[in-house]
């Protein structure tokens, strides 16, 4: 099948659905008091009696960033990658108020690939935090031989970023979807209303 645009047209093929019913303001204590009045909240759309669960959100044609520890593209270096224990150790200073974040994920850069791992637990031990992950991704991450994260490499250890927690919603253009309710939180950019 070949799809072509008519002359001077700019078609968009999308499986996206509009999120409507936005309300400004949020009283969730996981968001800092200073930001609560800036956050917009909406219920996710439903299809076939199921709430739409999404990993991407677009606002006015621009991809919004899932709530993250750092701005898009910024990452921190891990301390250890332990296949026997199936853990990754990171600086405890990167944990902040996240030990109880229910939907927290870790993005791990490992050579030419990335892994997105759902965090199961965080054990803070002094200046280090040992992180365990849910299955099946824990087994997949630690059992496959290549590419695993680099520890002690010429250019340093592999990098990571923590994402997908309401506690991380702190920058304009970030969003978060709460499960199982499906509630979507969005911190608009300055040019958005």
Say what each PLM segment does.
Residues 1-193:
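Extracellular polysaccharide-degrading/modifying enzymes targeting complex plant/algal/animal polysaccharides
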């Amino acid at each position: 099948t070949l799809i072509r645009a008519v002359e001077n047209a700019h078609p968009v093929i999308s499986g996206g659905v509009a999120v409507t019913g936005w309300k400004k303001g949020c009283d969730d204590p996981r968001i800092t008091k200073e930001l609560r009045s800036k956050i917009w909240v909406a219920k996710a759309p439903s299809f076939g009696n199921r709430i739409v669960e999404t990993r991407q959100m677009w606002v006015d044609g621009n991809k919004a960033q899932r709530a993250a520890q750092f701005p898009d593209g910024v990452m921190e270096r891990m301390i250890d990658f332990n296949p026997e224990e199936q853990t990754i150790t990171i600086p405890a200073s990167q944990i902040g108020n996240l030990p109880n974040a229910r939907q927290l994920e870790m993005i791990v850069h490992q050579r030419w690939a990335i892994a997105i791992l759902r965090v199961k637990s965080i054990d803070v031990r002094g200046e280090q935090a040992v992180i365990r992950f849910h299955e099946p991704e824990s087994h997949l991450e630690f059992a496959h031989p290549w590419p695993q994260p680099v520890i002690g490499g010429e250019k340093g250890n592999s990098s990571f970023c923590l994402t997908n927690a309401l506690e991380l919603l702190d920058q304009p253009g970030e969003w978060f979807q709460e499960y199982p309710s499906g509630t979507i939180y969005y911190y608009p950019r300055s040019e958005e209303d």
